[in-house]
Design a protein with these regions (language model features):
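Conserved hydrolase catalytic core segment
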Residues: 124-162
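Conserved alpha/beta-hydrolase "acid-adjacent" motif
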Residues: 250-256
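Flexible "cap/lid" loop of the alpha/beta hydrolase fold
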Residues: 151-180
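Conserved HGGG/HGGXW glycine-rich cap/lid loop of the alpha/beta-hydrolase fold
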Residues: 54-97
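Conserved acidic catalytic loop of the alpha/beta-hydrolase fold
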Residues: 108-125
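Short beta-strand/loop motif that positions the catalytic acidic residue
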Residues: 237, 243-245, 249
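Catalytic histidine-centered segment of alpha/beta-hydrolase-like enzymes
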Residues: 275-287
């Protein structure tokens, strides 16, 4: 009897994994069709290629996406602004068509952005960064204040308030999870683990094409502000900053953001009781605040 039960359970599990594999394959194919609709462009830079979306007119917002991102997520973060501003949305190192320069540090990523802006004939930008992209945007603002009009951070990585005695050398998912099928299987747990809807998986696919970037973020980008604390003199920032964060964010600590805000000169901090890491439900408030921030510095 028990052998029949065990066999039935095994068969049910096997069928489940097969069905999920079929669903995952279909979702990956659809994700590649979705990416094609962005009409992304590729520029040859000194170290390799960078792929980006360039849409809209007016003041320029350079969108710096987070982990599991790419030009698609970089653009989608700013799509509500496309009718008013020019959006430059590149894939960062290792994501969707963008090569890695050197060790892939935030400083190298910022330098690549400058090279892209030079190629596009753009002098100054507002930086808008989400999550892991915050380290790169902050690095850009510190290294190139003459190219930066303002810094906007959405539930972003934040610098520690003092040099940490220890920190995570690897801050991200282990490489074996950076796989279309494995992450698709885990997506029903997104709400519990990350506070995100299961459907978020569809904006992350194809994960196999983002894996290099994810591992680079986990090993280099995310630990950088702790590892090289002295290289991030936040108090010396020469540009204004606008920071958004939700108190129920499960991925980027709201408490750490509250502490870090005091380090930013000329900073506006807008917090939300809810919304999670994606600031769900606050599109209108964010659009108004960002528009006011950009317009104040466009004259």
């Amino acid at each position: 009897m028990w052998s029949y039960i065990a066999g039935g359970v095994f068969l049910a599990l096997a069928m489940y994994f097969i069905v999920q594999g079929i669903r995952c394959g279909a979702a990956v194919r659809e994700s590649k069709n979705r990416l094609a609709a962005y009409n992304a462009q590729t520029a040859a830079l000194s170290y390799g290629e960078i792929t980006y979306v360039d849409l809209g007119e007016g003041e320029v917002i350079l969108s710096v996406h987070g982990i599991f991102g790419g030009y698609d997520q970089a653009y989608d973060t700013c799509k509500d602004f496309c009718s008013d501003y020019r959006i430059i949305a590149p894939s960062r190192f290792g994501y969707l068509g963008s090569d890695v320069s050197g060790d892939g540090t935030p400083a190298s990523q910022a330098a690549a952005y400058v090279e892209l802006l030079d190629k596009l004939g753009i002098d100054k930008v507002h930086l808008l960064a989400t999550s892991a992209g915050g380290s790169v945007a902050i690095r850009f603002a510190l290294d190139y204040p003459q190219r930066t009009k303002g810094l906007i951070l959405y539930c972003s990585a934040m610098p520690p308030v003092e040099k940490p005695e220890k920190y995570a050398e690897y801050a991200g998912p282990p490489p074996f999870l950076c796989n279309d099928y494995v992450m698709f299987l885990l997506s029903p747990m997104f709400e519990l683990i990350m506070g995100m809807e299961q459907s978020t998986i569809y904006s992350m696919l194809p994960i196999n094409d983002r894996k290099v970037g994810v591992i680079l973020d986990a090993s280099v980008t995310n630990p950088d502000m702790a590892r090289d604390f002295g290289e991030y003199p936040i108090e010396d920032l020469q540009v204004p900053t606008l920071i958004f964060h939700a108190k129920d964010d499960k991925l980027a600590s709201y408490i750490e953001t509250e502490r870090a805000v005091a380090r930013f000169p000329n900073c506006t901090f807008i917090s939300f009781e809810s919304g999670g890491h994606l600031l769900t439900g606050h599109a209108e408030e964010i659009k108004e605040a960002v528009s006011d921030f950009v317009e104040d510095r466009s004259h």
